Amino acid sequence: MTAVSLLLAAACAGNRPKPITVPPTATDAVRPAPGTVQEGLASWYGPGYDGRRTSSGEVFDQDAMTAAHFDWAFGTRVKVTFLATGQSCTVRINDRFPNHKGRVIDVSRAAARTLGLIGPGTGRVRLEVVP
């Protein structure tokens, strides 16, 4: 009887499902305080997404000053500065993207144009939450 119990326990121990990592939803997103700063890699998106729904439910407009962030709350306003040039703009978070090592934000085509990111496609940025 003891041997059977041990076999059953051992058989069940290896069948645990792996946790699934998903981007935060609107209810568990982080509401950063004004002045919060983050640095990392930025990229941009637009063609292929224009007119589609964002994670917040808004229709994506590649010509609006918006961005996707992994876990900052929708509606958060962020000053984005391209460190290579010092160019900056303010965007509103309205979308999510999968967590990628080093990447902190995906900006719309309009924001990328203002920052000078269209050509290089990616660049190091400083994010600062603004009121």
Q: Where do the language-model regions lie?
A:
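Secreted/periplasmic proteins
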Residues: 2-131
